[in-house]
């Protein structure tokens, strides 16, 4: 899958989950059949860097030293999904995740 399509699918998924987010391993599990983990993680980091989603790290509840990473769409990301913001050529928004 092209990166701009994958980014759009991830952003649509985050929009569908709003106001909650998704844990990184769950996100990877959803899309790993279509893309490799590196492309998925690069795509979600791109979305974070552009301000369309935010990344939160919390300590793992059972494994000392490990962190659990969550992603959540931002208001800027919701505006992009809803068509209330200027289109971003790096993200192709699908009708559904």
Where are these regions (language model features)?
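Solvent-exposed edge beta-strands and adjacent loop segments
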Residues: 58-59
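Short acidic, hydrophobic short linear motifs in intrinsically disordered regions
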Residues: 20-31
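Short amphipathic alpha-helical segments that predominantly mediate membrane engagement
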Residues: 62-64
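Short, amphipathic alpha-helical interaction segments positioned at domain boundaries
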Residues: 67-97
């Amino acid at each position: 899958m092209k990166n701009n399509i994958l980014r759009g699918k991830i952003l649509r998924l985050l929009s569908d989950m709003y106001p909650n987010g998704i844990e990184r391993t769950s996100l990877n599990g959803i899309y790993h059949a279509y893309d490799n983990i590196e492309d998925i993680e690069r795509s979600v980091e791109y979305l974070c860097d552009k301000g369309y989603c935010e990344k939160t790290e919390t300590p793992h509840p059972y494994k000392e030293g490990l962190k659990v990473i969550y992603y959540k769409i931002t208001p800027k990301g919701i505006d992009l999904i809803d068509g209330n913001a200027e289109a971003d050529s790096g993200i192709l928004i699908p009708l559904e995740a």
